[in-house]
Amino acid sequence: MIDVHVHLAALPDGENGCYISAKMLRRPLARFLAWKYKLDFGKPAEANAFYIERLLRELERSAQVKKVVLLGMDGVYDAAGSLDKTRTDFLISNDYVLQVARSRPDRFLAGVSVNPQRRDALEELERAAAEGAALVKVLPNAQCFDPADGRYRPFYRALARLKLPLLSHVGYEFSLAGRDQSAGDPARLRNALDEGVTVIGAHGCSQGLFAYEPHVKTVREFVHRYPHFYLDASALTLPNRVGMLFILKRHPEIQQRLIFGTDYPLPVLAYPALGRRYLEAARASYFDRQAVVLKNLGISCRDFAAVTP
């Protein structure tokens, strides 16, 4: 099985095209990653290699997941389409994503990130497709663009023509500085769907605000209207998103569009599994724990390989 939602983290080493702001290095997520993975921010090349080695070890331990989509992260772009580093928390370059994916094609697929606001967005899509990208990932809340803006229809048409799925963050964004949280509303992905793009709403289209889940009506409409609309299961064991797991349990028609994903390196928690399954989940490897929790709740997932256009 493929995990469709795995983040590629990297520090800038002078060659990989990545960027991270001083502010981002002080944020809880960066401190958590440094602690959990024993990363030395003063030795970027070593830290980057160790992150990949750790991910490969987790994949070796998994009986369920054999390949993952590595996700990049584009930056914020100004009105002229130029990169605005003053508003960019971090950037994981497509060059780096493609390079790492090529290094282990048996384990990694490339999930590039292209902000449609960038001046060369269409050219970058063409390049990524030619170099074997599996999908395009966006995080509108932090990348400061509105997915519903009509100016991006040519971008969506290019995605459809190139048969590149669009994996879009849904809900509130806490790990980065979410500047416009309304951009995480899945209803804003309608233009992409109307243009024929295979759209995957991240995190089960949950809002990320604990019990408040306002997007269920939109999700049910999209499932009924668009055969090329999907959701992924990433981050759904986290307390602020777990409510959507129990909603999915009650809606088998939505489950039919659910794709397996975790949101690595964020934690996968065992507590939604009940009874003896809890112990099984708690003892399982990282990727298998997600599979055990979902199975315990009677939630089935599709494999990303089966839904690519």
Where in the sequence are the language-model features?
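Active-site environment of divalent metal-dependent phosphoester hydrolases
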Residues: 7-11, 75-78, 116-120, 143, ...
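Short, flexible/disordered intra-domain loops and linkers
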Residues: 18-20, 39-45, 77-89, 175-183, ...
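Hydrophobic faces of well-ordered beta-strands that scaffold small-molecule active sites
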Residues: 2-6, 68-71, 108-112, 136-138, ...
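Active-site gating/metal-coordination segments in enzymes
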Residues: 73-181
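H/E-rich (His + Asp/Glu) clusters that bind or coordinate divalent metals
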Residues: 205-309
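An N-terminally biased module of ancient metal coordination in phosphate/nucleic-acid-related enzymes
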Residues: 1-71, 77-88, 305
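Distinct, well-ordered alpha-helical segments
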Residues: 119-129, 147-152, 177-193, 209-223, ...
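Short, well-ordered coil/turn segments that N-cap beta-strands
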Residues: 63-67, 104-109, 131-134, 162-164, ...
